[in-house]
Amino acid sequence: MSNLSKGTGSRKDTKMRIRAFPMTMDEKYVNSIWDLLKNAIQEIQRKNNSGLSFEELYRNAYTMVLHKHGEKLYTGLREVVTEHLINKVREDVLNSLNNNFLQTLNQAWNDHQTAMVMIRDILMYMDRVYVQQNNVENVYNLGLIIFRDQVVRYGCIRDHLRQTLLDMIARERKGEVVDRGAIRNACQMLMILGLEGRSVYEEDFEAPFLEMSAEFFQMESQKFLAENSASVYIKKVEARINEEIERVMHCLDKSTEEPIVKVVERELISKHMKTIVEMENSGLVHMLKNGKTEDLGCMYKLFSRVPNGLKTMCECMSSYLREQGKALVSEEGEGKNPVDYIQGLLDLKSRFDRFLLESFNNDRLFKQTIAGDFEYFLNLNSRSPEYLSLFIDDKLKKGVKGLTEQEVETILDKAMVLFRFMQEKDVFERYYKQHLARRLLTNKSVSDDSEKNMISKLKTECGCQFTSKLEGMFRDMSISNTTMDEFRQHLQATGVSLGGVDLTVRVLTTGYWPTQSATPKCNIPPAPRHAFEIFRRFYLAKHSGRQLTLQHHMGSADLNATFYGPVKKEDGSEVGVGGAQVTGSNTRKHILQVSTFQMTILMLFNNREKYTFEEIQQETDIPERELVRALQSLACGKPTQRVLTKEPKSKEIENGHIFTVNDQFTSKLHRVKIQTVAAKQGESDPERKETRQKVDDDRKHEIEAAIVRIMKSRKKMQHNVLVAEVTQQLKARFLPSPVVIKKRIEGLIEREYLARTPEDRKVYTYVA
């Protein structure tokens, strides 16, 4: 359609010549102007506008409005447009219902828009004056409303348009190629016909489109679930979401993206979350078992789109993780290696840290769930604190196979993660103190730096109160080294001899070290006892008022041992010879690294060939439990450790059993370390009960100290509030039970540190 011409040009056409108009207009003249304008509007609608003059038409419309005939012009315009749309346009569209419907409607819409732009330009003055004053729709919008009501929303056209669009989209979803441009034009038309709103587009297309889509996706989800594994299903859902977004971009209005994606998410994800997650041989557990980080990442990404999606995943993951963790901590049984036990937990943590980082976007919910699960199952086993300490002990001892200091550091950092999950940190501290003492006293620490690094980690985690005793142990070692240097200088200066004994004494501060107040008895052999007495006199001369108590259970010794192998008779048979009577090529010398108790037992055999269990007990005075353990190490261990033989050859040690030196003892090593039976497996049951008793005693004091601290500051408190406050203060070390706290409160009331108030027995006051 060509534009209106800007003037009459060289044409001799006088029909449209502008004449001067009178100041007042009679009806006849008004009608003639309207007829002229009406004819021009109809010509524009028929696309015959080439001979029309824009100026003349504008001036005529201006004249009508100026002389208060705007209403006639506005009403006339509405009637002309309505008539054209009903009689011509609607008929054309109705005739095309079964043939080229969308193309016909689109063409009619384009023609109508073009015509209305031209008509608006002619009637611009009416828009500015009459429309503004009377608060009616402007010319262009009036044209849109009439087109909407008389064409697009006309009964069967409206239904046919909706159905056509829905059918085309349904066909495209099945893989057919459709005219996307026609769909896009129709959707744009519906949006424009909403006049600044979405109502027409929403009611005539979007709502039924979303409804149809929901049904389609419902069917699709059933098909996908029946035919695919979880990972393939997830990929198909992702593809479906992307396809729907792409369709919106190219065919529909952008505002439809959010609602259609929500429909896909609801029908393909939300309604089937549990089914997808719990799919046998392909769901979340399968992915976790087989380390499928990529598939887990896809599931996380998809489930993060819907409400409770990640919660559903988390619950399933948590259930699997707890099952794995419980299996690890309950597999303990007899002979479970503490290092393997902790390594198993660390490996499990590493696996789930990898999932957290690579699959779950370091999500806070997953992070908290994993931490909560580890705390849950780690604390199911009361031996976890001891085993963690033994694990660290293993890493900080000399002779760790090929690990650099940096690798040890990394392992210790991982161990600290488990330590954070531990509720009984005070139990760990007690064991750590024992194991550190053993490392320091046997000179087995891999390095002072590594030890101090570990203490620094514990200090950062629990504060200096937790590590003050451990740091005190290091100070004692340093002071002991200085003391021993001074002692050796003293021996040189005085010429005093230790009788061939190379003595090293560590003076330990009671309270820092795991010393025993009731020290186990032990009759130390004369030579080492004499050497120690010389040291005692030297030390007490320097430090008057101090007392030295030997801690036999913490000592060690290197013994020079000579074994006389079997001697052959003339007939070729062999006879075992004990003692030091025979020398020859069969003599083998070793240095035996033993505990103080083992040294005391072995040195008896310098005096006699055989001893019964009762005789050894009588001679050494070692407590029965310690004696049995020492003899088992010497007579029942591996062949390369068996320096004594026992009759009968059983694992148990009882009265009447006879012990002799094993002269057939051989070892490839010159220096032989005699392992203490069960030391690597942690404490025996009686020892564990004893440790637990000590921990409980310590806890009583800690709970009472916390109660007094709180009451001193608050003066008056209700029972439940006090219990909560005490728990809060102590939870970094252990979780005291309310029953134990109540007992400690009662103990403090008896000792008159606290008192109950007369009016309420559940309220306590501090007694200064």
Curated annotation (Swiss-Prot):
Disease: Pseudohypoaldosteronism 2E: An autosomal dominant disorder characterized by severe hypertension, hyperkalemia, hyperchloremia, hyperchloremic metabolic acidosis, and correction of physiologic abnormalities by thiazide diuretics. Neurodevelopmental disorder with or without autism or seizures: An autosomal dominant disorder manifesting in infancy and characterized by global developmental delay, variably impaired intellectual development, and speech delay. Some patients have seizures, others have autistic features or behavioral abnormalities. Additional variable features include cardiac defects, failure to thrive, or brain imaging anomalies.
Other facts: High-glucose conditions in renal tubular epithelial cells lead to up-regulation of CUL3 expression, significant increase in CUL3-mediated ubiquitination of MRPL12 and dysregulation of mitochondrial biosynthesis.
Function description: Core component of multiple cullin-RING-based BCR (BTB-CUL3-RBX1) E3 ubiquitin-protein ligase complexes which mediate the ubiquitination and subsequent proteasomal degradation of target proteins. BCR complexes and ARIH1 collaborate in tandem to mediate ubiquitination of target proteins. As a scaffold protein may contribute to catalysis through positioning of the substrate and the ubiquitin-conjugating enzyme.
Keyword Cell membrane: no
UniProt-annotated stretches for the region Disordered: 677-698
Expression sites by tissue: Brain, spermatozoa, and testis (at protein level). Widely expressed.
PANTHER family per the UniProt record, alphabetical: CULLIN (PTHR11932)
Family annotation (SUPFAM superfamilies): Cullin homology domain, Cullin repeat-like, Winged helix' DNA-binding domain
Keywords assigned: Acetylation, Autism spectrum disorder, Cell cycle, Cell division, Cell projection, Cilium, Cilium biogenesis/degradation, Cytoplasm, Cytoskeleton, Disease variant, Epilepsy, ER-Golgi transport, Flagellum, Golgi apparatus, Intellectual disability, Isopeptide bond, Mitosis, Nucleus, Phosphoprotein, Transport, Ubl conjugation, Ubl conjugation pathway
Similarity comment text for this entry: Belongs to the cullin family.
Organismal lineage: Eukaryota, Metazoa, Chordata, Craniata, Vertebrata
Pfam families, per the entry: Cullin, Cullin_Nedd8
Quaternary structure and interacting proteins, as annotated: Forms neddylation-dependent homodimers. Component of multiple BCR (BTB-CUL3-RBX1) E3 ubiquitin-protein ligase complexes formed of CUL3, RBX1 and a variable BTB domain-containing protein acting as both, adapter to cullin and substrate recognition subunit. The BCR complex may be active as a heterodimeric complex, in which NEDD8, covalently attached to one CUL3 molecule, binds to the C-terminus of a second CUL3 molecule. Interacts with RBX1, RNF7, CYCE and TIP120A/CAND1. Part of the BCR(SPOP) containing SPOP, and of BCR containing homodimeric SPOPL or the heterodimer formed by SPOP and SPOPL.
Annotated Cullin neddylation domain residues: 698-760
Modified sites of kind N-acetylserine: S2
Name this polypeptide is given: Cullin-3
Keyword Mitochondrion: no
One GO process term, biological-process aspect: negative regulation of transcription by RNA polymerase II
Main location: nucleus
PROSITE patterns: CULLIN_1 (PS01256), CULLIN_2 (PS50069)
Region entry Interaction with KLHL18, spans: 2-41
Cross-link (Glycyl lysine isopeptide (Lys-Gly) (interchain with G-Cter in NEDD8)) at residue(s): K712
Post-translational modification: Neddylated. Attachment of NEDD8 is required for the E3 ubiquitin-protein ligase activity of the BCR complex. Deneddylated via its interaction with the COP9 signalosome (CSN) complex.
